Amino acid sequence: VHQLVSTVRGHRRKEVPPAACVAAAFPPGSMTGAPKFRTVEIIDTLEPGPRGVYSGGVGYMSVGDGRNEAGGFDFNVVIRTAVVKPGSGEVWLGSGGAITALSDPVGEWEEMTLKARAVLRAIRACDEAA
């Protein structure tokens, strides 16, 4: 499994709200494929509903001190994350791969399950400890 880590830096135009910058970045092209907007349209027709936090972002925004510090934000892409549905005993785990016309379905399945394995082990350990 190859993992991508990127640091993206830039300067926001004053007329663009900080939240608009974050909204434009998610879901990232590394999760959707390219061209991003068309791919998101296709995903919306194929998947039964929204992905929730999976492929979204978790992070923070700071406003700065208004003089020298401009503020900023730092977000990560949510992958291999377990989401617990309160009171139900259900846990949801998103995992995926980059499927292309040349993909091998068995290989993609194996990659997806490999990516999910560590989180599944943690869930099982919690279940056994309960």
How should these model regions be labeled?
Residues 1-130:
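Conserved hydrophobic core element of enzyme catalytic domains
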